[in-house]
């Protein structure tokens, strides 16, 4: 098996998946499973790269012969905590597939391993006055900049969500209470979909965007790097004196404002479109701490 996780042979000669199958064969079928499940290409390549390294280290063992010590040895060669965590994620998914979906193993040799915790950085949200200066500078810059920054700062959209937003995702039936719908093409991310209440202010901003750019389909047909450049340009024009403001900073600021307004952990998970898992619970805990009343 190559480092991409692809078996160097034709599909017709790949044997069926069974307990005595080589690791390389199991990786081939796992890759097929991920592809059919609609996983992102980069995710599949990352998983299979780690699994190919694991296969090279454990060859010629069959999957039924793999033990916890094989997992420990592979993880122990990780040079950083982030590499160890990524490798464990790759192995965990692989063995969950073999035990659960494929049902060729009865025991997961990786189940008693846990990732080393990687501390989450405390965000530096924008204060209310900074937010107003930023939006004023965005309005002076362009209709596109104004709409983009407003959506990230006032509704907490991520950069990726901003770039997939379309004209038919904006409901202006009531201009005093517009609704912005966040959709995902990949079925795996349906849980992140949501609809967010905007304001009459956004209706005005949106109408200006339509007038100046007449978008056909995508509201922001630009590259991710272009969003970063817009934010950098507007931050400089606003004279905030900070060089650490990114699209994520705007989303963080929204989340902290929501926490100040009374949002709890469940509410933050929902409005931010996050998966309900322990890591994200820890993440929104940072917003709750920053949004709590001062001591």
Role assignments for model-derived ranges:
Residues 130-159:
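Basic, Lys/Arg- and aromatic-enriched nucleic-acid-binding interface segment
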């Amino acid at each position: 098996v190559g480092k991409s996780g692809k078996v160097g042979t034709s599909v017709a000669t790949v044997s069926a998946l069974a307990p005595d199958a080589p690791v390389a064969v199991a990786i081939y079928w796992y890759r097929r499973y991920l592809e059919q499940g609609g996983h992102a290409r980069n995710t599949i390549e990352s998983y299979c790269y780690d699994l190919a390294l694991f296969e090279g280290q454990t060859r010629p063992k069959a999957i039924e012969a793999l033990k916890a010590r094989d997992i420990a040895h592979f993880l122990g060669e990780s040079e950083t905590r982030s590499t160890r965590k990524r490798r464990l994620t790759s192995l965990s998914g692989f063995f969950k597939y073999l035990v659960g979906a494929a049902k060729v193993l009865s025991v997961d040799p990786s189940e008693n391993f846990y990732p080393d915790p990687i501390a989450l950085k405390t965000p530096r949200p924008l204060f209310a006055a900074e937010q107003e200066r930023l939006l004023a500078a965005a309005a002076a810059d362009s209709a596109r900049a104004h709409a983009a920054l407003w959506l990230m700062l006032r509704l907490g959209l991520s950069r990726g969500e901003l770039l997939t937003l379309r004209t038919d995702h904006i409901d202006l039936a009531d201009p005093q209470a517009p609704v912005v719908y966040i959709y995902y093409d990949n079925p795996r991310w349906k849980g992140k979909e949501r609809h967010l209440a905007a304001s009459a202010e956004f209706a005005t901003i949106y109408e200006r965007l339509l007038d100046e750019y007449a978008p056909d389909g995508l509201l922001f047909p630009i590259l991710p790097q272009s969003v970063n450049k817009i934010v950098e340009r507007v931050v400089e024009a606003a004279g905030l004196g900070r060089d650490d403001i990114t699209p994520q900073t705007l989303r963080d600021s929204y989340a902290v404002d929501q926490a100040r307004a009374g949002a709890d952990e469940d509410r933050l998970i929902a409005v931010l479109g996050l998966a309900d898992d322990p890591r994200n619970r820890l993440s929104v805990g940072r917003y709750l701490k920053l949004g709590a009343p001062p001591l």
